[in-house]
């Protein structure tokens, strides 16, 4: 996420699933028509999973490639099972069609040889309208759903969906959510379908409640672009960027998190802030731990500021300068998180944080 809220205001049907994962689609599933049949990379069927966690990557520029090179090195040493990409997949405006060349330049090419399923989350830049990242053209994000049918790697059968792995006695279920309608810089004020109490968000909430109630997975992990808690420049939901105006401060995103997510998932993984954060659970989060991995191509370059000063959060690890990614190792008995930073001067990666979180 690059657009600052203050600056903005001042200036202006799923494809086949391989492997033994089970898929649940949201009601907003989009169908890609007249696209070639593409075989998807298979989901793993083991109880030991190594999950690459990355976000805000889709620039196509050299730093993205350097971080991806470091990912490839890790994959060669200890293979990843799958990846989570936490939004802003196609900078700066998002795609113009499901066959846009940006998908190759900003996703497929940088991630070559990382041949496993990538669970994709929609970010504000993926839904841009007037200004890059304003989140004001939500239909633009449907091109990313349609691209699911064109890529072996890219997994986004709907704007929101869940995947459990393996299907029988699942170790984990990922709940991929789309909160762009309630977190946009250019909110959909005259589009009732996208309103906080409109059809899209109401159906998503009902779907999520049902899916969480029915889940038998050991680990339940929610995946969003916009975070609930955040010590970086964008701040916490309800305080986004320190700008207290309804709805752009994210108060409706906060309400969604508190009504449907926190206390029901062990982890909430988000991007949006170009930083690496492992936060402590708070009383408000009811035991859910917020993790932010949004530094796969850009960094905020400095100390946290703006909205985060309103209500800071305890943290096990914070980094607002370096690019990098995370690795989450899951078994039925444990969840271990590693944070890796990448030195852009030489391309070397370093494991700067390692902790058992569950």
What are these regions (language model features)?
Residues 1-17:
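N-terminal secretory signal peptides and thylakoid transit peptides that target proteins
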């Amino acid at each position: 996420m690059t657009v600052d809220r203050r600056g903005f205001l001042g200036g202006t049907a799923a494809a086949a699933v391989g492997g033994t994962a089970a898929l649940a689609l949201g009601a907003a599933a989009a169908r890609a028509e007249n696209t070639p049949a593409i075989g998807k990379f298979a989901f793993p069927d083991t109880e030991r999973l190594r999950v690459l966690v990355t976000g805000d990557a889709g620039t196509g520029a050299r730093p993205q490639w350097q971080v991806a090179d470091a990912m490839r090195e890790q994959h060669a040493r200890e293979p990843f099972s799958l990846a989570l990409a936490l939004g802003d997949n196609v900078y700066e405006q998002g795609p113009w069609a499901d066959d846009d060349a940006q998908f190759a330049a900003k996703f497929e090419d940088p991630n070559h040889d990382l041949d496993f399923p990538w669970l994709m989350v929609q970010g504000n830049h993926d839904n841009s309208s007037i200004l890059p990242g304003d989140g004001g053209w939500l239909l633009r994000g449907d091109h990313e759903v349609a691209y699911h049918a064109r890529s072996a790697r890219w997994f986004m059968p709907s704007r929101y969906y869940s995947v459990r792995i393996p299907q029988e006695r699942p170790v984990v279920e990922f709940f991929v959510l789309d909160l762009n309608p309630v977190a946009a810089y250019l909110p959909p004020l005259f589009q009732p379908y996208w309103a906080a109490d409109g059809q899209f968000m109401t159906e998503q909430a009902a779907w999520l409640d049902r899916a969480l109630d029915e889940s038998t997975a050991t680990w339940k992990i929610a995946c969003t672009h916009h975070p609930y808690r955040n010590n970086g420049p964008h701040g916490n939901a309800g305080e986004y960027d320190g700008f207290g105006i309804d709805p752009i401060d994210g108060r409706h995103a906060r309400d969604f998190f508190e009504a449907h997510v926190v206390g029901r998932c062990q982890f909430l993984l988000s991007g949006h802030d170009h930083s690496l954060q492992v936060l402590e659970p708070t009383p408000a989060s009811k035991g859910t731990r917020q993790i932010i991995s949004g530094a796969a191509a850009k960094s905020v370059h400095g100390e946290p500021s703006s909205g985060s000063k309103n209500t800071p959060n305890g943290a096990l690890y914070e980094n607002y300068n370096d690019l990098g990614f995370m690795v989450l190792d899951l078994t039925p008995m444990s969840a271990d998180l590693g944070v890796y930073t990448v030195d852009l001067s030489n391309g070397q990666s370093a494991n700067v944080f390692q902790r058992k979180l569950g």
